[in-house]
């Protein structure tokens, strides 16, 4: 089960898990909670903000402890790596990874129906078109390279955890217009 968490429904997370697992006794291997990425008219009403993102992290931790024997609670929040940094660094060493956290342009890309390639399904910035360019050319695009090398600005640029977190590039772009800007909802 996957659910997007916004400021509108953050207080319903626990009830959702309780209803599915405890009340309906449905066996769910993974319960995924995705952070809402503000865009367009929902920028004001759905955004979590710093306090909301911290609240989301705390709720995820609480749910993980409560349901540890019944389901796995996961999230795509890059900041979570900071709280498990020892384990994350061990994984990075084991698999020879330069960075983890936000996967935009690093662990994945998005190819839209018209061939437009973006660093992430939620980061609506074109880095090329697969119908006109090779994938290698697109992956060597300036934006893709800066994201991959974590050449970020603001708080994320100076953060000692940028290689294990990197903030959410889609959120940075949606709220500032710059995919390399700091994640404005970071609570660290």
Where are these regions (language model features)?
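Flexible mid-to-C-terminal extensions adjoining Fe-S/redox cofactors in radical SAM and related proteins
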Residues: 116-117, 121-188
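Radical SAM enzyme [4Fe-4S]-AdoMet core and its adjacent flexible, acidic
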Residues: 1-114, 118, 122, 126-127
């Amino acid at each position: 089960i996957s659910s997007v968490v916004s400021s509108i429904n953050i207080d319903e997370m626990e009830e959702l898990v309780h209803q599915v697992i405890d009340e309906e006794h449905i066996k769910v291997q993974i319960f995924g909670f995705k952070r809402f990425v503000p865009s367009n008219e929902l920028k004001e009403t759905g955004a979590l903000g710093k306090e909301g993102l911290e609240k989301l992290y705390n709720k995820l931790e609480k749910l993980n402890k409560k349901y540890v024997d019944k389901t796995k609670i996961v999230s795509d929040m890059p900041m979570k790596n900071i709280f498990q940094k020892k384990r994350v660094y061990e994984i990075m060493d084991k698999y020879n990874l330069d960075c983890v956290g936000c996967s935009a342009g690093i662990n994945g890309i998005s190819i839209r129906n018209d061939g437009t390639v973006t660093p992430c399904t939620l980061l609506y910035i074109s880095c090329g078109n697969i119908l006109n360019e090779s994938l290698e050319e697109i992956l060597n695009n300036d934006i893709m390279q800066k994201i991959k090398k974590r050449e970020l600005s603001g708080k994320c640029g100076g953060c000692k955890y940028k290689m294990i977190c990197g903030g959410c590039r889609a959120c940075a772009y949606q709220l500032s217009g710059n995919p390399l800007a700091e994640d404005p909802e970071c609570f660290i």
